[in-house]
């Protein structure tokens, strides 16, 4: 028989896959860096580290959470490119950073919060993209 924790962990991993897909889909359809696969991996990795941080016992959950943020920040730094006076990849870095936080939310069992935040993130990216498009047209 399957241990109850494994069912819970599997549900969390599946939800983090869905969260990564939701966030990565917008990036993918607009041909931006860090699309569906990358966001899924970031969400799942953060979820697994979060699950492990509280399931091991005797471990400071805050320290592992801080290390997730540090690791993701290192990954995000690799997406930022400076070309002469232009800086590219800041939004990609921000999206990966937020996706990691959503994966952590799922890992810690905050499903509703994670999905509401993912929806609001998508809405924000959509609205800002439309505003930027209108602004460019006026120029």
Predicted segments, located by residue:
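Hydrophobic transmembrane alpha-helices of secondary-active transporters
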Residues: 18-23, 74-81, 103
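Hydrophobic alpha-helical membrane segments of integral membrane proteins
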Residues: 89-94, 112-117
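Alpha-helical transmembrane segments and their membrane-interface boundaries
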Residues: 1-64, 111-116, 126-139
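Alpha-helical transmembrane-segment detector that highlights a single hydrophobic TM helix
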Residues: 59-85
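Membrane-helix interface "capping/anchor" motifs
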Residues: 29-34, 81-92
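Small-residue-rich segments of transmembrane alpha-helices in multi-pass membrane proteins
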Residues: 41-51, 72-75, 94-108
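Amphipathic alpha-helical interface segments
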Residues: 98-100, 118-121
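Alpha-helical transmembrane segments and their membrane-interface exit regions
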Residues: 72-78, 120-130
